[in-house]
Structure formats: structure tokens, C-alpha cells
């Protein structure tokens, strides 16, 4: 389908768990080819532009065996599912044996049906790619050992947890610069021209099956990061960076494919320059969860060209459920924040319903939990309002709240506005557990000389203000803890 909007809203689904839930409810196996219309409706509410089917690729039997033998992982599985059964453990979706839709989910044909079903609804499909490593039983391990970081018997003896002997070669297990090796994957060589060519081919094949690709731990392939991780084992870094070299051909063949980088360590800007449309905004996530209003505000002072290519989120398959981290009103304030900022927005299946258990990605089943229909209705209202009222249209500006000598609670307010040809919106959030008051000067020159009606799109309240006062001293704000205004000016 492609034709992505500038500020897409993406809904992540753990494919294995979702289809497992649907299968149990239906009393039969449900694949991606026969998901009921009502179930697609539930994950594509108004305001969603794309669905990320996380974990559709063929999982590794070798990786599954390692997971079943790992006492620490098994303990984490039982913490999530006290009634754990052997069939609940299916292996990691990021231990990929082949980039072919798993037969458990219906295979490639079922994936194609799902994509067509979504496209008929105007919804794009996002899929995963893992550039750094593959499963130990991936065909490349035996057929193309030159694509991997290689060692020798001395390495294997000195650090057996970091290396794998296979087919007469010693290959490195996957890792990043800061943690021990991952025992269930084999490390690809980002400096290898052959690997870069093979990656380009794989990405092109994935792009033919979807509208966007989310690249796992994309910063690990940056030349400086890879050199730091492997300390010269792979020779000097090439002149060209990995991603520009790999993506040049993809862009020629699939120009509209949106590329999203999972990115940490302040590598977002660099990955944007190397060809990614959007990068994870982990800094904003951390600052919101830490309830650091000043840091959130400082983050939003970054250049708009940078912010417009960030992916904002409050949870995903790697992070704890936001309902387990923030109380209800605080979660809603945070949700309004990320839903109305520039850039892309990511929501996670189960987030709207208030799920609190964060299941490991190795599992195909999650525990039953009490769901929160009121919270789900509120989230659906938020998405529908932001999309239907064209809130994120036109020019975005960060606004400043001022206070008084004896009242500086304005420091807990964050605010911004959007102005399009026919739309003006102001967002004010009290991102704290205390009441906050302040005045916010609105930036539009034609405010004075007439009255304006301000309508809160979430609260369904209206009030009238003089345009001169809105310009100076500004819109007076008085918000209870964790409350917000999402205002339309008419």
C-alpha cells in the first residue's frame, strides 16, 4: 500500500500471542489468513495508520532448544505464566532462522492475505528485520561462513560462551559493546561487502511483503559502534557506512518503504542521516517515566527536523507495560504528550486495555488479566480526536509557560501548538503529581482584536477568551495533577 503519512501512528502486535488469543477464543487454529473482520477492527481503530506484526518470521528450533535449557529464562517464563506448558515456549522472534513467515502463522500466503486485508482498510504493514545476527541454524551459518565474525580455537577456548564451533569454523555469538554475548545467535560481519550485499537482498525481499521495516538494534551496524564491539577482529572499517551502502539499492526498488531504527545511545540523529525515516525516541520515554518535566521540555527544544523523525512510545515488546509504571492519570497525561508531538507514534497491543504483565517474547501465551474498558475507550477517543480533528497539522511550536514570583508551578507544565491553514490547536499537559498554574502566550499575530472560542476536544468543554489576552499576558492555565488541555481555537 505505502503512501505513508508524515506523522504515522503505528500499532504493534505480538503476532504469536495475538493469534494464540484468537485461536483459543475461536476454539480452532487462527492464522493470519483467517483473522475475523471484528478482530482486525479491534487493532485498527480510527487514527491508526499502520500495524506492526512483530515476530512473523520463522523461529529457530536451535534457539528454542537453548531457551528451554536456560534456567534463568525458564524462571522468567514461570513468573509470567505460573501454569507454563511446554508448548507455550516457542523461541525468540529475534532469533530468526529464515525470513519466511512462520508456518505457525500460516506461512507467506497468509502474510500476504493479512497485508491485503489491512490495505483494504487503508492500513500499512510493518515487519521486522534483525541486521546484527541470525539464528545458529540459519542457512548462512553453514553455506556462507564468510558473512560472520570469525575466530579460532584459541578464542573458543578462552571464551567458550562467546564463540560457536560449526562446520569447521569458529563463529562469534551476537553481542553489543556493553553486555555478554547472546548464546542463541551468530554475529554477522557489518564490514563484509558480501554481508552488505546479502543484507540488501534480504531487505528487498522483506520490502516486497510489507510497507515498512523496523530494524532491530540498528545502531550496532554503524562503523564506529561495530569497531568498538569487535575491536579490530574484522579489519579496518570500510569508507562507506553500513546503512547507506545497504539502503541505496532498496530505495531504488522500494522508494516508499518506511524504515524505522530501534536506536539507543544517542545515535538517533546519525541513523536519520544514514537513511532511516524514523528512530526510536528512548530519551523521551525515559524522561517521561522518570517524571522529569524539565528534561522532557529540554528534549523538545531539539531541532524540529530531528524531532519530526522520532518514534514516540510509552511501551513496546521490550519495555514494561506502562500501566505497571505510571498511575492512571499519569499514563493519560503521558499518552496525550506522545500522541500530539511531531514524529511518529507507537502504541502497543494491550496498552489501551491497561494490561500490566509484560510477557517475554519467547512465549505464545499470556496470562488472563482484568481489562479496563474505560481506559480503552479513552485511548480510542484520543486517537480519533488527534486524527479526526487534524491536531498534528501544519507548523508545530513549543510554547513556554510563565508563572508569578510566589507561584512557579508553571514549571510542571509543558505546552505546544499546531497551526495549519484552517486548524489551530494548543496542547498543555501538567506532567506532575501537583496542581500547576501558568500563563502561555499564544504565538499567532492575528489573535488581538477579536474573541476566540477554545474547545477542549477531550473534555468536550468550551470557553471564550479575548484574543489580546491570549497574546499577552497569555492563556491562563490551571490544571490538577496529571491533567491536560487539548484545545481547538475557532
What are these regions (language model features)?
Residues 1-490:
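Active-site and adjacent substrate-binding regions of carbohydrate-active enzymes
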Amino acid at each position: 500500500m505505502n503512501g505513508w503519512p508524515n506523522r504515522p501512528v503505528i500499532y504493534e502486535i505480538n503476532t504469536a500471542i495475538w493469534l494464540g488469543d484468537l485461536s483459543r477464543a475461536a476454539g480452532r487454529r487462527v492464522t493470519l489468513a483467517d483473522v475475523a473482520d471484528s478482530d482486525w477492527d479491534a487493532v485498527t481503530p480510527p487514527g491508526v495508520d499502520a500495524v506492526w506484526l512483530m515476530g512473523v518470521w520463522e523461529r529457530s528450533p536451535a534457539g528454542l532448544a537453548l531457551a528451554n535449557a536456560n534456567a534463568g529464562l525458564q524462571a522468567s517464563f514461570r513468573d509470567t505464566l505460573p501454569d507454563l506448558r511446554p508448548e507455550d515456549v516457542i523461541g525468540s522472534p529475534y532469533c530468526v532462522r529464515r525470513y519466511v513467515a512462520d508456518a505457525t502463522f500460516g506461512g507467506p500466503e497468509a502474510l500476504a492475505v493479512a497485508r491485503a486485508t489491512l490495505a483494504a482498510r487503508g492500513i500499512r504493514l510493518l515487519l521486522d528485520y534483525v541486521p546484527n545476527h541470525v539464528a545458529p541454524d540459519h542457512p548462512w551459518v553453514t553455506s556462507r561462513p564468510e558473512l560472520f565474525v570469525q575466530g579460532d580455537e584459541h578464542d573458543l577456548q578462552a571464551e567458550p560462551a562467546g564463540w560457536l564451533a560449526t562446520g569447521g569454523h569458529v563463529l562469534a555469538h551476537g553481542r553489543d559493546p556493553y553486555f555478554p554475548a547472546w548464546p542463541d545467535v551468530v554475529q554477522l560481519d557489518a564490514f563484509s561487502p558480501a554481508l552488505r550485499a546479502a543484507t540488501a537482498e534480504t531487505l528487498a525481499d522483506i520490502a516486497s511483503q510489507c510497507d515498512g521495516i523496523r530494524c532491530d538494534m540498528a545502531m550496532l551496524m554503524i562503523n564506529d559502534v561495530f569497531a568498538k564491539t569487535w575491536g579490530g577482529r574484522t579489519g579496518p572499517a570500510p569508507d562507506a557506512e553500513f546503512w547507506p551502502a545497504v539502503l541505496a539499492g532498496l530505495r531504488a526498488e522500494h522508494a516508499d518503504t518506511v524504515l524505522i531504527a530501534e536506536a539507543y545511545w544517542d545515535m538517533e540523529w546519525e541513523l536519520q542521516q544514514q537513511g532511516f525515516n524514523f528512530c526510536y525516541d528512548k530519551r523521551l520515554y525515559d524522561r517521561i517515566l522518570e517524571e522529569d518535566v524539565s528534561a522532557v521540555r529540554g528534549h523538545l527544544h531539539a531541532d524540529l527536523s530531528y524531532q519530526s523523525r522520532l518514534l514516540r512510545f510509552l511501551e513496546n515488546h521490550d519495555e514494561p507495560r506502562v500501566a505497571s509504571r505510571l498511575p492512571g492519570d499519569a499514563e493519560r497525561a503521558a499518552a496525550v504528550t506522545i500522541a500530539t508531538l511531531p514524529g511518529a507514534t507507537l502504541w502497543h497491543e494491550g496498552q489501551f486495555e491497561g494490561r500490566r504483565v509484560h510477557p517475554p517474547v519467547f512465549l505464545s501465551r499470556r496470562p488472563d488479566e482484568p481489562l479496563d474498558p474505560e481506559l480503552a475507550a479513552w485511548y480510542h477517543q484520543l486517537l480519533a480526536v488527534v486524527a479526526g480533528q487534524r491536531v498534528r497539522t501544519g507548523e508545530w511550536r513549543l510554547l513556554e509557560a510563565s508563572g508569578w514570583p510566589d507561584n512557579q508551578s508553571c514549571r510542571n507544565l509543558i505546552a505546544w501548538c499546531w497551526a495549519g491553514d484552517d486548524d489551530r490547536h494548543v496542547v498543555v499537559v501538567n506532567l506532575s503529581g501537583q496542581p500547576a498554574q501558568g500563563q502561555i502566550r499564544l504565538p499567532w499575530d492575528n489573535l488581538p482584536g477579536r474573541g476566540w472560542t477554545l474547545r477542549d476536544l477531550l473534555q468536550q468543554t468550551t470557553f471564550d477568551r479575548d484574543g489580546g489576552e491570549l497574546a499577552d499576558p497569555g492563556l491562563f492555565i490551571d490544571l490538577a495533577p496529571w491533567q491536560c488541555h487539548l484545545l481547538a481555537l475557532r
